[in-house]
């Protein structure tokens, strides 16, 4: 099989690429190394690598010829940078996604798996969060990513392109970003401890997140290439377990001092995924426990 991975040099994308290469597949990677979060990039030299921008349709379109499956992860993928530069967020996450879908349609790609976000649920929905709940977008990031969701559904309904959308819940694991003020909290805490600094906790630290290991996310993406139903639909990819930030800090560095910093606008208070739909239709479920992973580091 031949796969194309947008954002394939980033955190989640590079883990998917490595899995595909290990399984002997042909892989095309598109990534322009765009990041407002000091992210590192990982290019697998066994893939066909292109430092292209998904906003440039004429540049990326020829690469879709002969591709069977597309994993679309290229994005402005952080809340705070999207708030600071909403135009870029819309250009990348909406126009870029439309370009990927149109190129996939033109070249008769079998399936597009789109990576979206649990930020779509906002503040108003009670936990556990279900795919059927209304969107409550609080920032340009969630608005632009959910616009991508609607594009995927439209391309399925109108053009017959098979798409599957994932709403990820706080992905962590190998290659997670650890640098910059917007680094995800697990990587940030680990970096702060390794540097001998206190862990910085936003607000009171009682806000919760559903932390999902990147290996489980990779498995979900692979499962989406094999399912027979669920096209044009959304699936939560999480664990169904919520952990607050103070609990997380204690897991990473028991007894260590934390430094509370002001809350940031546009962020959810509590997240916890209902993953029953993914279990039923994708035959997927998470395997990696957060505390086990931390203790095994």
Question: What are the functions of these language-model segments?
Answer:
Residues 159-160, 187-201, 254-261:
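A short C-terminal helix-loop "cap" of Rossmann-like NAD(P)-dependent dehydrogenase/epimerase domains
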Residues 289-297:
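Amphipathic terminal alpha-helices
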Residues 1-169, 215, 284:
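N-terminal Rossmann-like NAD(P)+-binding domain of SDR-like oxidoreductases, especially those catalyzing
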Residues 55, 84, 92-95, 132, ...:
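Residue-level signal for the nucleotide or nucleotide-sugar donor/cofactor binding architecture
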Residues 73, 192-193, 224, 251:
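Conserved catalytic core of Hanks-type protein kinase domains
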Residues 147, 151, 155, 185, ...:
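Hydrophobic alpha-helix immediately C-terminal to the catalytic Tyr-X-X-X-Lys motif of short-chain
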């Amino acid at each position: 099989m031949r796969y194309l991975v947008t954002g394939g040099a980033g955190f989640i994308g590079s883990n998917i690429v490595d899995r595909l290469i290990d399984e002997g597949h042909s892989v095309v990677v598109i990534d322009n190394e765009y990041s407002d979060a000091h992210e590192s990039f990982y290019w697998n030299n066994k893939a066909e690598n292109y430092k292209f921008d998904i906003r440039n349709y004429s540049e990326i379109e020829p690469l879709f010829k002969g591709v069977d499956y597309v994993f679309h992860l290229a994005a402005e993928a952080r809340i705070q940078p999207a708030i600071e530069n909403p135009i870029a967020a819309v250009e990348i996450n909406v126009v870029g996604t439309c370009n990927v879908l149109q190129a996939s349609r033109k070249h008769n790609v079998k399936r597009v798996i789109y990576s979206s976000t649990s930020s779509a649920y906002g503040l108003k929905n009670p936990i556990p969060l279900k795919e059927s709940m209304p969107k409550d977008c609080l920032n340009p990031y969630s608005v632009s990513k959910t616009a991508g969701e609607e594009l995927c559904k439209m391309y399925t309904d109108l053009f017959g392109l098979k798409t599957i959308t994932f709403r990820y819940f706080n992905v962590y694991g190998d290659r997670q970003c650890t640098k910059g003020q917007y680094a995800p909290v697990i990587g940030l805490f680990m970096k702060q401890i390794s540097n001998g600094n206190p862990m910085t906790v936003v607000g009171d630290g009682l806000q919760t997140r559903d932390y999902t290991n990147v290996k489980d996310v990779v498995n979900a993406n692979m499962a989406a290439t094999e399912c027979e139903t669920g096209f044009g639909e959304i699936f939560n990819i999480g664990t169904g377990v919520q952990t607050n930030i103070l609990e997380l800090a204690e897991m990473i560095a028991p007894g260590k001092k934390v430094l509370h910093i002001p809350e940031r606008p546009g962020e959810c208070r509590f997240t916890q995924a209902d993953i029953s739909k993914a279990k039923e239709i994708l035959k997927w479920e998470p395997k990696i426990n957060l505390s086990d992973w931390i203790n095994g580091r």
